[in-house]
Amino acid sequence: MIKLGIVMDPISSINIKKDSSFAMMLEAQRRGYEIHYMEMNDLHLDQGKAIADTKVVELKEDPNGWYEFKSEQMIELSELDAVLMRKDPPFDTEYIYATYILERAEEQGALIVNKPQSLRDCNEKLFTAWFPELTPTTIVTRKAEKIKAFREEHGDVILKPLDGMGGASIFRVKENDPNVSVIIETLTNHGQNYAMAQTFVPDISNGDKRILVVDGEPMPYCLARIPAKGETRGNLAAGGTGEARPLSETDMKIAQAVAPTLKEKGLIFVGLDVIGDKLTEINVTSPTCIREIEAAFDISITGKLMDAIERRVKGE
């Protein structure tokens, strides 16, 4: 029997209709895995050994009670076959410390999904810079004058922080926007923080597409997140609506161009954000949208993920 750990935000406050971590656990349970639930504060190091306070959990698809803890124990993380790191951002120093604990567990024999070093290496916004031919025209800088020059050159631009999630603090700045200086000051914290500027992709009205890649294989369906009326952000957290659809030829080309690098880096479950024919983000921490895609199409993304985990655990 495979023992699967999962590090996540409190299970008591998830929305089971939409939560991808819940979907993963359901599939693991269907396969007879023993599931060990953890939050970040359950991870520890003791003399270099990665240990954790875990709760064995059973799940059911019941909005009135979707989980039950069966036992509590302190274990070495290496006793688990695999651990899913599914904690949502913020990607702060605490998150980074947790990846070091998980890296010790990895060195002691557990498979960590996604690879701890790659979680640190691959910032969700910056990692797209490794694929400049696929992205909108982009600069990353702290200097207000550089952002202003970029906006003057390109007219209609998107400005965003490097650490936001769910569409937080994303600004569209058009020509002659009187607020451009204050937006730049806010995003860069008066030149103390890096910010990203990208040319605006008009195709956002057709949705910001979330494409899932499992172990280097792009899933054939995506979730297009359509912005609310008058919005430029498709994020569901910003009021967008999700519409599952098959990948277009361009979507597939983008995903196939990025997929080998992801696999090489031990990024087994990744969400690509694509607007029109441009890659805008590579989500490696806790990509979502599984539930919505699986509800619309006859595909088991979680099944593909567990297959990939089993292959690695068995050393295939």
Curated annotation (Swiss-Prot):
Catalytic activity: gamma-L-glutamyl-L-cysteine + glycine + ATP = glutathione + ADP + phosphate + H(+)
Pathway: Sulfur metabolism; glutathione biosynthesis; glutathione from L-cysteine and L-glutamate: step 2/2
Entry cofactors: Mg(2+); Mn(2+)
Cofactor note: Binds 1 Mg(2+) or Mn(2+) ion per subunit.
Keywords from the UniProt entry: ATP-binding, Glutathione biosynthesis, Ligase, Magnesium, Manganese, Metal-binding, Nucleotide-binding
Binding sites annotated in the UniProt record for Mg(2+): E281, N283
PANTHER family per the UniProt record, alphabetical: GLUTATHIONE SYNTHETASE, RIBOSOMAL PROTEIN S6 MODIFICATION PROTEIN
Family note: Belongs to the prokaryotic GSH synthase family.
Official protein name in the record: Glutathione synthetase
